[in-house]
């Protein structure tokens, strides 16, 4: 249809989110969508009228250094063509800013009308001389705000405020009540958030206490933990989160020391209290970074009742289109990628292109990142193509810390961090920040990627993920993605596959099934980072193994699965030294191996030539049983019970007649538990020996007996639980459950 439709309510929009089509849930790409109609430039007078009517009010952070300005004073020539040099712009702007708070505030507008449609779009382009952020920083920064207008109904249909790169979902609002968009600019990066309710100086992601949200982006699909979080970048520093800024360097030195920037001083960058020199300078994430505060407010100079104390000029974008290029040596940022031996430092470059060279300059609908918004406009206007479907990558980035529920140094939990992280795909040079701990990468091409996540003060995380062609199995109607192929049911690795369901479902354990087109990264969608001071590198050295390893997973006794990824040969992951871990490996035949890891004070732990099959799993049973017996003894030292055992055990997995060192019921209960555990360990040793010698029937007999013995050990644990400190009892339960699962795997294993 070409006319306007009915206004969508917030409730209706949320209903559409829950019941959205596969394409909507997939995280659609404008480049993969149906083509939009062509646009033409609106005539000068009409364009000016529309631009003045919808001109945004711009709210800046109190620490902002680079306000929207006119780049033309910094023009020069290169080979006869007009260019703007990064050195000239930054140095010249800094010099002018020493004399006036906001040098030549300017906003450029570009108004496009879709052919044969009442849909017209007013674009507001904001140029800043520099961009300083937590990762990406560059000379010249162009940001855009779109107002989609129905000229027949004379009302705004959609506000779109750009957020970082095309990988990040924009802040968008369908059918806004407010005609004039109020925009909150992110410090340093100038990413734009919307503020359309009565709380003018803050961003509100969801409706609270009757105050409507500032965006109508649909919820994040694929993770139950993020099911209520709208997929929009927002404004993290205004939402209770922190972003440490990094000082940009050129030729190994801070930019303010460069001889071509004589007017630039340290004070011309984001203040020191908000910055760090590098992410690995800290032993833990920073907790003392100040929150966002409103500073300069800019309003259109022609508005009768302006909100701000400063005013900007509104200039047609065509007046600056003659500039051939915005130049400057590429700045880089350091990004740590975990390696088996040493971590690599990837220097990734960022750049900015002039607006008039970008597809969205003439086709603004290409910048709609929310599929439900695009679908709504496509239903109302023939000029907008229906959304398509390509891969999206999602995860929740948390932090791993010790838990009081476990013995000291033997267990973790994960929790939300107040410090945002940044992610990088090996295939893309632009890093993407999280928002509220949510990692959302849009328009990820099909194929295998390496995802790396950094956070200030934490060790880096990296894993391989595979994104399928979103429409490969469904004629292009919906997508399907997975981190790796489905695994055998007898393993404990969590896999990500998609189904034909049209809405997101939740499994019995609370894990959301991935909607079509969504790849869930991490372990069950969670990426727990470890503070640098607590990090231990866990290496899996596959060199010399007799099988090809395909997957590695790491599970803490209390926090559960923390790492789960496909691998190519050797692998490395950082773990918290306060955890107690089971490391699982899988080979290309589907055989599983398991190993206990207790890093404690180690700087690195290596699993050499990991094996898969019965022998590996039986050896694991021996290790975890002895470890649990030691935990029980240590917890009861100095108390009645828990005395020594003869370390024996019979071939059927029962304990010998050793009596231990204590007397009374408590001694019997605790002593019986430790004897049961050590008997299991001794029998597991025999099972491993038989498997290694090729005696499969003998190994299975020992494993069957161990299964029964583990059941008795669990009974004795409950008998002794009143005499054990809570953390020790908790650890014993978790490890016995782990041993039972691995025992079943060992029995089912065909490989010795």
Where are these regions (language model features)?
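Short N-terminal edge-element motif at the start of the domain
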Residues: 70-144, 148-158, 422-424
């Amino acid at each position: 249809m070409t006319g306007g439709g009915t206004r969508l309510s917030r409730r209706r929009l949320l209903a559409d989110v829950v019941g959205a089509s596969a394409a909507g849930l997939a995280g659609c790409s404008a480049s993969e969508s149906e083509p939009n109609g062509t646009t033409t430039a609106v005539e000068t007078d009409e364009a000016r009228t529309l631009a003045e009517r919808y001109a945004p009010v711009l709210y800046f952070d109190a620490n902002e250094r680079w306000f929207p300005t006119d780049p033309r004073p910094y023009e020069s020539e290169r080979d006869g063509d007009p260019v703007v040099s990064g050195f000239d712009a930054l140095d010249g702007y800094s010099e002018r800013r020493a004399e006036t708070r906001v040098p030549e505030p300017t906003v450029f507008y570009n108004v496009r009308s879709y052919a044969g449609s009442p849909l017209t779009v007013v674009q507001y382009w904001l140029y800043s001389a520099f961009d300083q952020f937590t990762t990406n920083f560059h000379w010249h920064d162009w940001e855009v705000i779109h107002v989609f207008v129905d000229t027949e109904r004379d009302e705004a249909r959609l506000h779109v405020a750009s957020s970082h790169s095309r990988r990040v979902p924009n802040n968008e609002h369908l059918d806004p009540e407010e005609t004039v968009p109020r925009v909150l600019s992110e410090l340093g990066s100038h990413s734009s958030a919307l503020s359309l309710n009565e709380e003018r100086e803050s961003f509100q992601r969801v409706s609270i206490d009757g105050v409507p949200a500032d965006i109508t982006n649909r919820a994040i699909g694929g993770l139950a933990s993020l099911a209520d979080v709208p997929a929009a970048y927002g404004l993290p520093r205004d939402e209770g989160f922190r972003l440490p800024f990094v000082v940009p360097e050129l030729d190994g030195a801070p930019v303010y020391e460069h001889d071509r920037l004589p007017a630039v001083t340290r004070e011309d960058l984001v203040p020191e209290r908000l910055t760090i020199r590098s992410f690995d300078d800290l032993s833990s994430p920073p907790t003392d970074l100040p929150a966002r505060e409103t500073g300069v407010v800019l309003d259109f100079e022609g508005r009768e009742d302006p909100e701000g104390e400063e005013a900007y000029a509104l200039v047609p974008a065509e007046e600056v289109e003659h500039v051939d290029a915005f130049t400057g040596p590429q700045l880089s940022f350091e990004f740590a990628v975990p390696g088996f031996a040493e971590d690599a430092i990837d220097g990734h470059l960022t750049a900015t292109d002039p607006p008039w060279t970008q597809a969205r300059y003439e086709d603004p609908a290409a910048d709609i990142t929310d599929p439900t918004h695009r679908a709504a406009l496509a239903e109302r206007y023939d000029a907008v193509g229906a959304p398509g479907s390509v891969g999206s990558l999602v995860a929740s980035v948390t932090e791993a810390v010790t838990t009081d529920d476990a013995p000291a140094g033997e267990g973790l939990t994960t929790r939300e961090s107040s410090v945002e992280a940044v992610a990088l795909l090996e295939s893309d040079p632009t890093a993407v920040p999280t928002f509220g701990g949510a990692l959302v990468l849009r328009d990820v091409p099909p194929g295998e990627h390496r995802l790396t996540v950094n956070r200030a003060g934490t060790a880096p995380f990296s894993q391989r993920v595979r994104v399928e062609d979103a429409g490969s199995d469904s004629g292009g109607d919906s997508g399907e993605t997975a981190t790796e192929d489905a695994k055998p049911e007898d393993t404990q690795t969590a896999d990500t596959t998609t189904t034909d369901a049209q809405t997101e479902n939740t499994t019995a354990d609370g894990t959301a099934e991935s909607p079509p087109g969504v790849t869930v990264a991490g372990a069950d969608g969670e990426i727990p980072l470890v503070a640098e001071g607590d990090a231990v590198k866990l290496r899996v050295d596959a060199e010399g193994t007799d099988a090809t390893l395909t997957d590695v997973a790491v599970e803490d006794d209390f926090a559960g699965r923390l790492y789960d990824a496909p691998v190519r040969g050797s692998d490395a992951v950082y773990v918290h030294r306060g955890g107690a871990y089971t490391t699982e490996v899988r080979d290309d035949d589907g055989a599983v191996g398991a190993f206990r890891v207790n890093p404690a004070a180690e700087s690195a732990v290596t699993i050499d030539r990991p094996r898969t099959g019965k022998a590996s799993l039986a050896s694991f049973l021996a290790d975890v049983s002895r470890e649990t017996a030691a935990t029980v003894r240590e917890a009861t030292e100095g108390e009645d019970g828990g005395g020594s055992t003869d370390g024996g055990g019979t071939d059927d997995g029962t304990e010998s007649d050793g009596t231990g060192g204590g007397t009374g019921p408590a001694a019997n209960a605790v002593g019986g538990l430790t004897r049961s555990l050590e008997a299991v360990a001794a029998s597991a040793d025999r099972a491993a020996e038989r498997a290694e010698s090729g005696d499969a029937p003998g190994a299975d007999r020992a494993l069957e007996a161990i299964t029964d013995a583990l059941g008795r050990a669990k009974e004795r644990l409950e008998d002794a639980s009143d005499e054990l400190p809570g953390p020790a009892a908790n650890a014993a339960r978790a490890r016995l459950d782990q041993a039972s699962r691995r025992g079943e795997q060992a029995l089912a294993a065909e490989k010795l």
